[in-house]
């Protein structure tokens, strides 16, 4: 996203507006000038993609989570060592104005995912990688950042606006690190390139907006938003502007270098300033550019999206709640204390999930976990709290039915419009006087054990609650995800006994970075890749349910590196298929073997794979009852 063609133009045609800079020197100068600790605001998702590609991690395995977390901790420490305080801000929602762009990207990315699975048929080695990021890491990275000792926040509107505004309003911020050409347009602190960032020297390129405007465009900095709206951005689409831009070109190729001089002269001749308070100017621009005044509102919206002196109002919770609840929803979202889905659900009645690494061999994960989400919706919106019932569910503030717009990227879903999903009731809930608790009571009044009981009811898994309640916090998400895959989602298991055993065993390894790095790159097959995706989508769903229930366990225990490593899982699964042995899975360590039997008993309890009933000796040759 950003301004169409601007990065290429500035790098190829504006040498003085692209300066190599040292972040350490910039920070020192800022501290000397303002006597504050210098802060660098980092576009979180942008950083995540760049840093993940930096390492040796292979995303198709499902994520080498511990290695990624340690790498992130290393770079955060390095920032602090040069006197810079990094603050990460992540996309916390998809704005309505960007939904079409989001959908188009998801469709393109899902086509790429299917190509990856085609590659698996030709090459089963780990080197055949997607070049992307592991499933769900975009939803979880802000929590990894927080545990690594840095500040992390989630936006409640378009992240580039939030980042630009935060930087402009805080004197201690000296720069923004990202790769989005919109930051050249915003009148905020200096914009540093993530693409050119050197992870060793901490040097990069500064895109100088003042130099670009005055020296190369011959416009004022304040006119850059208008320039953006006339060359194409996320609101005023390039496709709409193409006929106008073509009329300014010397050739039939609509490249910025071919029309930029004529465009800037045109702006000056018309005396356009981009003043959003002048509706007359908006109409004049629309008439000249599009041939009618019909697009004046679009120009106005495009310009307003860069106006940092405007506050974008935060959406309110869609049902009637107390001011305390309203405030808590926004604070938990901003401070990364809830799953990011909660804000979108409560305030916009939307659920968004990007493409994941899966093929067409089974139902898409988005559909498999949908009923669990639907039960979350029922709890979040008080749909079935008396006097409401299944026959008479709760409504929004305005009296509308609770219907969630689900935007989930999977094969066969064109996302021309959302899927409309209704809440589902809970079965046999026995806490809080035999009724479904109000969402405010669930968050603020119930004990952790009572919250965990609601969590268990939402999942509808075979595992007995008492066994769940006795688990260490680090094993709750793992155990519940596996129990769902065995008997909570479909009538027949979605996971084989040997695969269950491998998931349990790898969770119990005392993982060390060096040992994980030294593991040989495993052979890959589509089934194992699909399985890891299914598991990680389950982890993400557990996060949603736990946040729905007021976080009965601390967020940090939900993070995958506590119980999962993708490379280790593939390595152990390959070994187990050749030599299925408990002792081999557990590194021949008696203490690990003992923990394995204990955790496996919990995971499979009351299911078709229950260790007291299923012939596990046929699965693992040295299995002992």
Question: Each PLM stretch: what is its role?
Answer:
Residues 166-194:
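Acidic, metal-binding active-site segment of PIN/NYN-like and related structure-specific nucleases
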Residues 85-86, 152, 174:
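Hydrophobic anchor at the start of a short beta-strand
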Residues 64-65, 130, 151-155:
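Short, flexible loop segments at the rims of nucleotide/cofactor-binding pockets, characterized by
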Residues 1-81, 85-90, 94-126, 140-144, ...:
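Charged, low-complexity intrinsically disordered segments
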Residues 96-98, 160-165, 184-187:
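Short, well-ordered, mixed-charge alpha-helical segments that flank or form enzyme active sites
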Residues 90-92, 151-162:
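Acidic carboxylate-rich catalytic motifs and surrounding loops in phosphoryl-/glycosyl-chemistry enzymes
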Residues 131-137, 156-164:
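Active-site neighborhood for divalent-cation/phosphate handling
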């Amino acid at each position: 996203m950003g301004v169409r063609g601007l990065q290429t133009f500035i790098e190829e045609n504006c040498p003085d507006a692209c300066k190599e800079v040292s972040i350490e020197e910039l920070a020192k100068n800022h501290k000397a000038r303002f006597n504050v600790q210098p802060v660098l605001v980092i576009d979180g998702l942008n950083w995540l993609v760049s840093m993940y590609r930096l390492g040796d991690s292979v995303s198709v395995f499902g994520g080498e989570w511990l290695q990624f977390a340690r790498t992130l901790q290393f770079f955060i420490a390095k920032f602090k060592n040069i006197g810079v305080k990094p603050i990460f801000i992540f996309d916390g929602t998809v704005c309505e104005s960007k939904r079409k762009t989001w959908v188009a990207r998801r469709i393109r990315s899902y086509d790429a995912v299917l190509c990856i699975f085609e590659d698996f048929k030709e090459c089963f080695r780990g080197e055949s990688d997607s070049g992307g990021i592991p499933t769900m890491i975009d939803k979880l990275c802000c929590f990894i950042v927080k545990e690594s000792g840095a500040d992390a926040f989630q936006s409640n509107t378009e992240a580039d606006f939030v980042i630009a505004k935060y930087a402009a309003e805080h004197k201690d911020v000296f720069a923004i690190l990202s790769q989005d050409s919109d930051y050249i347009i915003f009148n905020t602190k200096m914009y540093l390139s993530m693409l050119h960032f050197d992870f060793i020297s901490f040097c990069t390129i500064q895109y100088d907006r003042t130099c670009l405007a005055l020296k190369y465009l011959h416009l004022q900095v304040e006119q850059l938003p208008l320039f953006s709206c006339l060359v194409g951005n996320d609101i005023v689409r390039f496709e709409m502007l193409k006929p106008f831009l073509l009329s300014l070109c010397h050739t039939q190729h609509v490249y910025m270098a071919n029309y930029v001089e004529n465009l800037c002269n045109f702006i000056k001749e018309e005396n356009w300033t981009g003043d959003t308070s002048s509706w007359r100017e908006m109409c004049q621009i629309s008439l000249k550019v599009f041939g009618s005044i019909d697009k004046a509102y679009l120009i106005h919206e495009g310009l307003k999206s860069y106006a940092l002196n405007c506050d974008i109002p935060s959406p309110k919770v869609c049902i009637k709640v107390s001011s305390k609840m309203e405030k808590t929803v926004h604070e938990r979202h901003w401070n990364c204390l809830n799953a990011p889905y909660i804000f979108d659900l409560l305030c916009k009645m939307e659920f968004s999930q990007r493409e994941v690494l899966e093929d067409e061999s089974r139902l898409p994960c988005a559909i498999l976990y949908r009923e669990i989400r639907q039960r979350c919706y029922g709890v979040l919106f008080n749909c079935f709290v008396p006097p409401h019932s299944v026959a008479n569910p709760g409504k929004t503030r305005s009296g509308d039915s609770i219907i969630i717009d689900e935007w989930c990227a999977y094969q066969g879903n064109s996302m021309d419009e959302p899927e409309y999903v209704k809440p589902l009731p809970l079965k046999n809930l026995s806490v809080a006087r035999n009724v479904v608790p109000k969402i405010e009571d669930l968050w603020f009044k119930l004990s952790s054990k009572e919250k965990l009981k609601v969590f268990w009811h939402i999942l509808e898994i075979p595992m007995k609650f008492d066994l769940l309640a006795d688990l260490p916090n680090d094993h709750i998400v793992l155990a519940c995800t596996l129990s769902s895959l065995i008997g909570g989602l479909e009538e027949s298991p979605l996971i084989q006994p040997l695969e269950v055993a491998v998931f349990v065993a790898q969770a119990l390894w005392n993982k060390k970075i060096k040992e994980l790095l030294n593991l040989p790159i495993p052979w890959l097959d589509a089934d194992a890749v699909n399985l890891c995706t299914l598991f990680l989508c389950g982890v993400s769903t557990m996060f949603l349910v736990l946040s729905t229930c007021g976080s009965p366990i601390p967020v940090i225990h939900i993070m995958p590196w506590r119980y999962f490593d993708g490379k280790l899982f593939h390595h152990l699964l390959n070994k187990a298929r050749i030599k299925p042995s408990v002792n081999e899975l557990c590194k021949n360590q008696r203490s690990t073997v003992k923990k394995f039997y204990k955790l496996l008993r919990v995971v499979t309890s009351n299911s078709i794979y229950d260790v007291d009933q299923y012939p596990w000796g046929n699965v693992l040759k040295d299995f002992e009852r």
